[in-house]
């Protein structure tokens, strides 16, 4: 009879029935824990996640933290909620496992909480659990995955100090692939750039900027030229920009930014006519709706003012 109640997910009815039989009460007290768990587990293994979640929730509320199956019941409950896309409930259960040292589900639980929190833009929480995952990772691949998560959280939190630290740690990994290496270099370079550490940014940008067919590489090529410019090496900046114009890229935004920078270089050299020609050509050929056209207009106005000042100065000198 017990088996029938378990298989039909009516264990509560069975327990209620047996409580009406006095001689079974002692046996029931010791077996109710197992009955409740086994019934919920069966629903889970059959893929009946709504019934499993309900049964496991009842088990956890009634018997835990002292029940025989609390750890695995928490794991099954978390997975059931995850399958049902009830992510807040899933996070609650996975968090219990992630914070329970030494349990066999800790690594997976940390990963789930981190990923779900990241998707909710809760980057500080996500960072914490990615960090926990990196410390208990069972392989270098999983440790790298966790470190990439930490890096992206740091990036989203605009924490440049953390970006530099995490990226540097990630770059020490022996089994890191080229895509992940470039991401780490890119993020660290951007952090250095934001901190005006242009010399350090140059080192990280150089290998990424060799391939401008990616968005990352195209931006790196522009930033490389901009770093040289800020360091006063305008000839090197110009060389990088002219190199960029000869490379094939579909990321016209960063090429346009580079040409605007080239115009700035010409202005610094007092070559105003050439600077204006670069801007006018770009204005006629760049049609995307973004901040490039606004930047062009601003630069042209600045050049016009310089030209007017030069004319005024020339007239004044002639009158002397």
Task: Please tell me what each predicted stretch does.
Residues 1-320:
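Acidic, polar-rich low-complexity tracts and alpha-helical solenoid repeat scaffolds
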